[in-house]
Amino acid sequence: MFEELKKCKTFKEIYTILGTKPFEKAAFVLVLLWVLLPAWSCAEHFYWGIVGVNTMQKNYAVEAGYKIAMQLVGSLSLVFVCIYLLGRYVMNKGQILQKIKNEPWHFCLLAMLLWSCISTVLSDDIYTSFHGTDYRFDGLQSYFYYAAMYVCAFIVANTKKNKVICNVFAAVATLASLIVILQDFGNPFINQCFVGGPRTAMFFQFNHTGYYLNLGIVCLMGLYLYEKRLWLRFYYALSLAFQLFAILVNSTFGSYLGSFFAMIMIIIFFYRKVRKFDYKPLVVVAIFFLISLASYMGYVPTSSGQDMKVNLQTLFADTSDILENPLEATDAGHGRMTLWQQGLKMIPRRPIFGYGPEQLDKELSEIMWVDRPDNEFIQHAVFLGIPGLLFYLGALITMFIRQWMHMRKLESTALIAAGCVIAYLVSSLFGNSMFYTVPYLYMFLAFAGGRRGEEEK
């Protein structure tokens, strides 16, 4: 092959000789690197914990290390995607337009990215909008990394490779679950290594850990439903129970709700695909119900003091307050209602291009010491304007409709990923985007929009 490549005089000749397999293999490796980033951060925590530097130095080193690793993998992905797309353009100019016509969500996501560029240029603080804040690292630069992750995941067309990625993701999430539990139970060595706060694992805040575990739980549900080998189903069931226990210890109720609604949808997807009764969804529901019941009865200890009973009481009380007087229910959702109201007030002031990424600190810090509205849909509308939100919704809606119509022909990994996307979207109603959670939304989104007609053997 190398001798043939030396003789090439045009890009078309180079891409003709290479074919698609080298690109798919490279994309697979890059997606795996993305998925392993939390494990890398975990190793960093252990290293600095063993070295024994003070807490401030340790936090700085770990946060900087995670961001540098993400930048490295993101930059490699971005360069690879540029090379890949150049080849696609040279080889299949007409097919690209046909692809967008058949799968319009690609156009919506591209339009959202381009709109983000305009919003950044028109921002009052272009530097912060481009680079993001020191804490969240979620500016335009990271948006391009997310886009690269999406394309890389989309390139991985092989079902077995997709399953490997899902399995690795679930395994890393199980590792995070173990650390959350050991942190909350007061293990001295773990608390010496992981000093971000209680129930945070390798992330910066316990809620962010909940967003991540939410995806791991639904991924395991899907892997269990579509697995034929008994020993693997047993492993997935145990891991699922363990992660459910961990997310209740973590006590991020919005993420728990994401897992609950995603469980319902992923079971609907399963029966719509197989078109016959199967007992496996009942096992998933039983595991979810029993672990939740244990928490409700006080058998899942958590230092937060917020078990299932407390969370449900709070949910019903907040819902009642909102229905009675939404303007006065400012404490609903642990104060999120105030942030939602303020975010909604900001949208009409800059409805077209928004304020730009990461431009809420001045507005929200006067109300509460935060810089996000704790709702990613409101966040998109404020940052990118109403068109930016519509592009985002357009991608989600068109993908859902298109894939729903062809569900029987979809690969199992596409349906697993669709459940993970739903889990993320539900939890995002109460949460924030972070540089270490958003990439996995776009990874699963790419898998959910996967190829049809390639049944597994």
Residue ranges of predicted features:
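Hydrophobic alpha-helical transmembrane segments in multi-pass integral membrane proteins
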Residues: N54-S116
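Alpha-helical transmembrane segments of multi-pass inner-membrane proteins
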Residues: F2-L5, T10, G19, A26-W40, ...
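Short aromatic-rich membrane-water interface segments that cap or initiate transmembrane helices
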Residues: K58-M70, S129-F144, G196-T209, R372, ...
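TM-adjacent membrane-interface loops and short helices in multi-pass inner/ER membrane proteins
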Residues: Q205, D307, L315-V370, F377, ...
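Membrane-interface helix caps and helix-loop-helix hairpins in membrane proteins
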Residues: T128-T133, L248-F253, L429-F435
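Membrane-interface capping segments at transmembrane-helix boundaries
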Residues: V90-M91, R451-K457
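Membrane-interfacial, low-structure loops and terminal tails that flank and connect transmembrane helices
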Residues: M1-K21, V90-E103
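Extracytoplasmic catalytic-loop and juxtamembrane helix elements of membrane-embedded
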Residues: M56, S129, P188-M202, S304-L327, ...
